[in-house]
Amino acid sequence: MIELAAIEAARERIAGAAVRTPLVRLHVEDAPAEIYLKLENLQPINSFKIRGATNAIMLASAAERAKGLVTASAGNMAQGVAWAARALGLPATIVVPEHAPEAKLAAITRLGGQVRKLPYDDWWNVIITGHVDGTDGLFLHPVQDPGVMAGNGTIGLEILDDLPDPDAIVIPYGGGGLTVGVASAIRALSPQTRIVTAEPETAAALVAAIGAGQPTDVDYRASFVDGSGSRCVLDSMWPLVAPLVDAALAIPVAEVAAAVRTLAERVRVIAEGAGALAPAAALTGLAGTGKVVCIVSGGNINLSKLADILGGATE
């Protein structure tokens, strides 16, 4: 669990870089809950990752940053690091899985980041080990860095500022850094609020871990929900995540696609696959009733894929 003081300090630290995003109501007839959307897709990089990346980089010393920055990311953390590196005049090396969407890769390059593609298993090994062969810059772990998690936790502070009494907060689960950060803030200030995670059923590692009582490998099937889900919950994250999560959900990819369409039609919001996971959980009723806050974690989706989904594609 991240200390509340660290999250509150992060809010001050990142104020010049990250946007205080709105919390808006999603009005849908016969919805099973009173659904609210925390629109992190409106950040400068269209993802919440700017929060954690900025906080972690600002916590590092000038000497630590001098050789440049390195991270491993499916795309959004990469953009956060590249954004901050450009602002500081530093080089950034980004290691991505070879299935990363072109929209995210183009954004990394546009921000000045140097992209290195790896097969998924090799990329996942970087996540596990925190090491990239052939680089000597400051490695910013996209998940388990305490500064990253504290920055992510600022989302929880903003949610409670706008809606002090949510019944549940639904968080898309990728590596666990967003969940630990947000849940730490919520547990400290609103302990009665349920913490619910959502993963694509094609890569529901947390669901499997909770069922088994420990991290366990699952079959990973790539889908357009590329920013969430994994082969296995990181051993380092399991003791942090497990006590904070009240329910873990596996969402069918077709329901995520339907949520992408609903957000576009009803509130003119563009969500990537991971960003639509939480709304999908709420719209299907899996997240429960009452006031349900859904974190729309990002909006970096290939426009061709978005067009396909808006046209009725289910995966």
Task: Give a label for each model feature.
Residues 1-315:
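PLP-dependent amino-acid enzyme catalytic core
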